[in-house]
Structure formats: C-alpha cells, structure tokens
Amino acid sequence: MNFKYIFAVSFLIASAYARSVQNDEQSLSQRDVLEEESLREIRGIGGKILSGLKTALKGAAKELASTYLHRKRTAEEHEEMKRLEAVMRDLDSLDYPEEASERETRGFNQDEIANLFTKKEKRILGPVLGLVSDTLDDVLGILG
C-alpha cells in the first residue's frame, strides 16, 4: 500500500510540474508575441516621426528658398541658396535612397564614397543647425 501511495503522489507531483512548465512556456511565448508587437508599434511610430521631420525640413527649406528667390541677393545669400538647394536634393535622395546611391556611387571607390557621405551630412546639418540656432536666438530674444 505504501508503494501505491508513493507512486500516486509522485505521479501527481510530476503531472503538476509538467503543467507548470507548459504554462510557463505558453506565458513566455505570449510575452514574446506582445514584445514583438510593441517593437513593431515603436518602429512604426519612429518611422512616422522621421517622416514628419523630413517633411517639415523640406517645407522649411522650400519656404526659405522662396523668400530668397524673389529679391536681389548678395553673394553670401547666393551661397546660402546653393546650400539650401543641395539640402533639398539630399532630402529628396532620402525618399529614394537606392536611386540616389546608384547615381552618386557610380565609378567611385570606397574612400570617395565615405567622403561623399560625410560632405552630404555636413551640407544637411550646417544649414539646419544654423536655422535652429537663429530660431532659438529669436525666441530667447522675445522671452528675454
């Protein structure tokens, strides 16, 4: 009788352990699915934010270009206009990166490609940072 009792208790413990392991695996797989869904949502939100920023930058650059277009420009303003046009081309190339990279990298070696992208980053960041600093100066001047 003791043998039957020990066997029954052992069987109950083993089945309870198996059920708890199975439940743990199911909850882990459910957590993985939820984490994957949240990562997709985060990526989607990040993509929308980047798209919005890109659109805003394009709009700001177009607005600046139109203000400089209809009046006489100094040499400095002409250079700034050229930089803004380059920024617009670079922003447009972000919409179609495959075509832009094919156009730009045809016939270049790796060092020239690296230099080209470094120059492109400087061309984008220079005018954008200038606009941001001018805007902040204006805002601080109004507040101060």
Curated annotation (Swiss-Prot):
Expressed by the skin glands. GO terms for biological process: defense response to bacterium; defense response to fungus; killing of cells of another organism. The modification Leucine amide is found at L143. It is found in: Secreted. The keyword Signal applies. Residues 1-18 form the signal peptide. InterPro entries: Bombinin (IPR007962). It comes from the Eukaryota. Its main location: secreted. Residues 19-43, 74-123 form a propeptide. Keywords: Amidation, Amphibian defense peptide, Antibiotic, Antimicrobial, Cleavage on pair of basic residues, Cytolysis, Fungicide, Hemolysis, Secreted, Signal, Toxin. One of its GO terms (molecular function) is toxin activity. GO terms for cellular component: extracellular region. Pfam families: Bombinin. The keyword Signal applies. Belongs to the bombinin family. Maximin-3 shows antibacterial activity against both Gram-positive and Gram-negative bacteria. It also shows antimicrobial activity against the fungus C.albicans, but not against A.flavus nor P.uticale. It has little hemolytic activity. It possess a significant cytotoxicity against tumor cell lines. It possess a significant anti-HIV activity. It shows high spermicidal activity. This is Maximins 3/H5. It comes from Bombina maxima.
